[in-house]
């Protein structure tokens, strides 16, 4: 905790007062977690909600927390009723960064041989859409974790930063890559080289955040978006997510070819037929995820 306070004091910009988040219900599967809280939400329990829950450490991302996060993600990924996932933090911090105490005494050999931080990548492999609902600090690994999600909603007082430079290192979980793709080279370079934080408003203007919400309604608005996504065909949603993500990995020509392939693939699904039939018949589609 002391190390986190030192890091927070180094990140430039005024500190914000804490805000309160709503109470949470236990995970439906009965799993016992130490560092997260997970549950199903939405009118028909179609949304998986995961809350990072290390408030005394400002949700510092220790190995145990990441392991539990991966377990909850796997459970929701395998649940046929869940169509989208919301990832959020606490009242003061989404996540203030990686756990510095776990990293302090690591050597190059330790990092290389253990593929340090490799287990963070599981979030990027989830096929169901994941929405980050960010209140408070999203610093370092917390900012990287949010950027691994497909959509970012931010509370009005949220702040984003990559302050690793201030403790003698650089982002190691995709920060230099995803931040640059999201906000462009100039702002990303400034944030990475100075450790400066940006506000939710600046993050939205730069393209990092898609929506700013009142603090009190942030999570519920993210859940509403997730419910809307979950109401569509899950198999087609997965195809759409894959196609959009390909834009960051492929050339325009390659990405367009993949898009066409996935577009054609929807014509092999019952849901495509149902969706177009429902449109012609002027009724709501009844997707079966087939």
Curated annotation (Swiss-Prot):
GO terms under biological process? branched-chain amino acid catabolic process; fatty acid beta-oxidation
Among the GO molecular function terms of this UniProt record, one is:
delta(3)-delta(2)-enoyl-CoA isomerase activity
Task: Please give the residue positions where the record annotates the modification Phosphoserine.
Answer: 114
Entry's Gene3D superfamilies? 2-enoyl-CoA Hydratase, Chain A, domain 1 (3.90.226.10), Lyase 2-enoyl-coa Hydratase, Chain A, domain 2 (1.10.12.10)
Q: Name one Pfam family in it.
A: ECH_1
Q: Name one GO cellular component term.
A: mitochondrial matrix
Entry-annotated residues carrying N6-succinyllysine? 101, 115, 204
Q: Where is this site: Important for catalytic activity?
A: 164
Q: Where is the transit peptide?
A: 1-27
Q: How does it assemble?
A: Homohexamer; dimer of trimers.
Pathology noted in the record is:
Mitochondrial short-chain enoyl-CoA hydratase 1 deficiency: A severe, autosomal recessive inborn error affecting valine metabolism. Disease features include brain lesions in the basal ganglia, neurodegeneration, delayed psychomotor development, hypotonia, spasticity, and increased lactic acid in serum and cerebral serum fluid.
Its recorded name reads Enoyl-CoA hydratase, mitochondrial
Organism the protein comes from: Homo sapiens (Human)
Q: Which gene encodes it?
A: ECHS1
């Amino acid at each position: 905790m002391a190390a986190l306070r030192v890091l927070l004091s180094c990140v430039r910009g005024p500190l914000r007062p804490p805000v309160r988040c709503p109470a949470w219900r236990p995970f439906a599967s009965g799993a016992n977690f130490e560092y997260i809280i997970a549950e199903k939400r939405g009118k028909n329990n179609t949304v998986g909600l995961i809350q990072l829950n290390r408030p005394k450490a400002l949700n510092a991302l220790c190995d145990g927390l990441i392991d539990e996060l991966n377990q909850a993600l796997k459970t929701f990924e395998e649940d046929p009723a869940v169509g989208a996932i919301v990832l959020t933090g606490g009242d003061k911090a989404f996540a203030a960064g990686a756990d510095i105490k776990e990293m302090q005494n690591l050597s190059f050999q330790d990092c290389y041989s253990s593929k340090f931080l490799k287990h963070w990548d599981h979030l990027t492999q989830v096929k169901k859409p994941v929405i980050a609902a960010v209140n408070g600090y999203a610093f370092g690994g917390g900012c990287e974790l949010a950027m691994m999600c497909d959509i970012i909603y931010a509370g009005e007082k949220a702040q984003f930063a990559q302050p690793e430079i201030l403790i003698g290192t650089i982002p190691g979980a995709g920060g230099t890559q995803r931040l640059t793709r999201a906000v462009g080279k100039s702002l990303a370079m400034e944030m990475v080289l100075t450790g400066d934080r940006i506000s939710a408003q600046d993050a939205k203007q730069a393209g990092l955040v898609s929506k700013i919400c009142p603090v009190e309604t942030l999570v519920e608005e993210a859940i509403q978006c997730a419910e809307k996504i979950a109401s569509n065909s899950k198999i087609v949603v997965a195809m759409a997510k894959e196609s959009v993500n390909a834009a960051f990995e492929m050339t325009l020509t390659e990405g367009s070819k993949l898009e066409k392939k996935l577009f054609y693939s929807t014509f092999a699904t019952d849901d495509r037929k149902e969706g177009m039939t429902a449109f012609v018949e002027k009724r709501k589609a009844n997707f079966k995820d087939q």
